[in-house]
Amino acid sequence: SNKSVGDEIRIGRRGSMNGTVTVYGKSGHSAFYGTYINPCTALAKIISKLKSVPLDKGTKYMPPSNLEFTKMNVDNISENVVPQSASAKFNVRFNSTYKSTSLKKKLSKIINAVAKKENCKTKIDYKVSGEAFYTEPNKEIYMVKKVVKKVTGNNAKLNCRGGTSDSRFLGSIPRLELGLRNNTIHMVNERTSISDLKKLTKIYKNILHNYFT
């Protein structure tokens, strides 16, 4: 929940994938143009290309997939020598348009195409934190909405906001997420009110009653 218990119901989550791209060129003194291949130039073009190409248009409940670079590194203490390699780290939050395997193929194709034009080689490492998932609104989800409306008066919005969640480990099982407000989530002294707990308990009780009767 966001501002009050039951104002939102999550019916999916975006996936998260981290990546490291390392570009290998040829080291050399900057005064002797043509004797080196600058991996920094290639990396800059890779970054520009990845940021300029839309990954998708989003879905009804999920925004377009988004890639952000989070770190760039060149292991070079000299200011007038072109380095042998340069690297960058990125994170992608991707919607249900992709599985991580298909997204990896798309990103690798873009990266390698740019590197090839710059006569550089690359190494790309990926780490998937979670796949995107989505449950099509069904009678159970609408039943939960009615329960929330009855208990709280909220007309719960269906969405897929936020980061990854532990429900990503449930595989292809249909699911929804409904819980307490997240206004103090991950903070020191994370807490909730007793009144919110009572509301949520009543919601859960009514959901179980409606589902099993």
Where are the regions a protein language model picked out?
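Fold-level recognition of mixed alpha/beta catalytic cores in primary-metabolism enzymes, strongest
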Residues: 1-52, 189-199
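Short glycine/proline-enriched loop/turn "hinge" motifs that connect secondary-structure elements
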Residues: 10-15, 79-84, 168-172
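Structural element of the ATP-grasp superfamily
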Residues: 21, 90, 144, 169-170
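Short, flexible turn/loop "capping" segments at secondary-structure junctions
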Residues: 23, 81-86, 181
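A short beta-alpha structural unit
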Residues: 66-75, 91, 95, 122-138, ...
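Zn-dependent metallopeptidase/amidohydrolase metal-coordination segment
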Residues: 147, 151-212
